[in-house]
């Protein structure tokens, strides 16, 4: 995240760090004891899921927090890695997540029609500037949901199943934020998908969660 600040410990108990061979790869969010939500491009093509771990309950990449093994990753079968559509995936955990003060699920938004031009919150461990380092501390930033019609004009790939944010140059998502949660009113409205790296005053684009709630529910590990 560019232009954010260190998040208070425990404020975002749904935040996940997906780490591949120990290095932060993507954000994700806790849906329930067995399932974590992320972007398809974070897990698509990973041959060895044994090297992918789900870290929860910590704000710091220098700490492991609570670590969970991955049983399976389900990528939306309509995911298009060129058009960046249907960029959504579920990570099934081998053992159930234990909830506590620092580890809690987030609910999914089913109705986001009134969100345009309203505030939302992005969290992640993405770079704090283009080409910059990964921050150790989880970052938070308040953004604004960009009007959909404007976003479709600004970013040619954008369709109805995307949702966008834009505030100003110097604020936004960056590499390593992918797969992480965009939240409004206590519900997740987006999954970080793509943008014009980083924070150049163009909209950031997210998978619109409400468009995929039925897919998510159908593909959860029960």
From Swiss-Prot:
Principal subcellular localization = secreted
Against SUPFAM superfamilies, the record matches this protein to: Trypsin-like serine proteases
Protein's UniProt keywords contain Ribosomal protein: no
Note the SS bond partners. Answer: 26-42, 151-164, 174-198
Q: Where is the signal peptide?
A: none
Cellular component terms, GO, for this chain's entry? extracellular region
**Keyword Disulfide bond appears in the UniProt entry:** yes
According to UniProt, the reaction catalysed is: Preferential cleavage: Tyr-|-Xaa, Trp-|-Xaa, Phe-|-Xaa, Leu-|-Xaa
Q: What is the protein name given in its UniProt record? A: Chymotrypsin-1
Organism from which the protein derives: Solenopsis invicta
Taxonomic path: Eukaryota, Metazoa, Ecdysozoa, Arthropoda, Hexapoda
């Amino acid at each position: 995240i560019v232009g954010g600040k260190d998040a208070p410990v425990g404020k975002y108990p749904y935040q996940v760090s997906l780490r591949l061979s120990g290095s932060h790869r993507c954000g994700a969010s806790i849906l329930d004891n067995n399932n974590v939500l992320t972007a398809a491009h974070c897990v698509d093509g990973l041959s060895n899921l044994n090297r992918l771990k789900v870290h929860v309950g910590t704000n710091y990449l220098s700490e492991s927090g609570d670590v969970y093994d991955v049983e399976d990753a389900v990528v939306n079968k309509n995911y298009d890695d060129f058009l960046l559509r249907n960029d959504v995936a579920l990570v099934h955990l081998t053992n159930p997540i234990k909830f506590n003060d620092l580890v809690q699920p987030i609910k999914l938004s089913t109705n986001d029609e009134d969100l345009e031009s309203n505030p939302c919150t992005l969290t992640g461990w993405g770079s704090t500037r283009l080409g910059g380092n990964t921050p150790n501390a989880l970052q938070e930033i308040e953004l604004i949901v960009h009007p959909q019609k404007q976003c479709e004009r600004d970013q040619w790939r954008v369709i109805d199943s995307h949702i966008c944010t834009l505030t100003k140059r110097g604020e936004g998502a960056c590499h390593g934020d992918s797969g992480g949660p965009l939240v409004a009113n206590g519900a997740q409205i987006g999954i970080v998908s793509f943008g014009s790296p980083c924070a150049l005053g163009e909209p950031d684009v997210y998978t619109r969660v409400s468009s995929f709630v039925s897919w998510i529910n159908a593909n959860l590990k029960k």
